[in-house]
Amino acid sequence: MCREQLITQKPRERKPKSAQQALQSLMRLCARSEKSSGDALRLMQQWQVPQAERQGVLERLVKERFIDDGRYAEAYVREKSRLSGWGARKIAMQLRQKGVSQAIIDEALGQLDSDVELPRLVEKLRRKIRTTKYTSDYELRGKLMRYALSLGFDYDIAQCAVEDSLVEQDL
């Protein structure tokens, strides 16, 4: 195919999936990785599954334990806190956007170990200091605070971590 044909070619129209096709696709997806009920609903909307049938498909997935928001939230909290170094606020916000209920989010966030949270943040801030350009200690403190807060940590924890990381760097 030449370049002009690729440019003028219209995107393929996707045929809407039936409820049965969506169920099979979601079962395959959920068998490979955890999905939330919100993820499943978004995918069904993208696949143009009829509105009336979406809830039935979701109920079947939940009944057969392909989708469990509690299990999903626990895995998400574990992954984002340990691997990505996120704080509780950012994790909770992301879970809310994925359609997980507040009660499940609160329960999943209960597994966070607050004793490990501060040392991890201090280590991330130490690495950040090495790559940050600054002209004064005041400017560096501001940049580190913004960084810690953007990771989703509470203000008190962020402030302690910034102070600890600056003391260790002799700044």
Task: Give the residues covered by each predicted segment.
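An alpha-helical, amphipathic repeat domain used for nucleic-acid recognition
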Residues: 1-171
